[in-house]
């Protein structure tokens, strides 16, 4: 079965993340490295779905883990119609020039049934940094 023939799920959100280093907000001499990341959430399902909350797992270059939980994304709980995309940019300060983020969006379908959308791990790295 090809991707085009794949059955459409009632509730299916696709997440893509584009991270970047923010040198103008970073101060390596103070062990402060700031990263921005732009997230695109697209409703690839056949019914409306709403992002209710988020859970991030942030790991720095020393393997220290921080978990962040909160309502919505950038102060919103976007309701996405089928085919609709919501995009936002946020930031993450780290004490190391490299790290990773991964997480989960907690969502609800129009029927009130909750579901989770995994956010694949992505790399936060200062340019020209070897791991």
UniProtKB/Swiss-Prot annotation:
Coiled coil: none annotated. Residues 7-131 form the ApaG domain. Pfam families: DUF525. This is Protein ApaG.
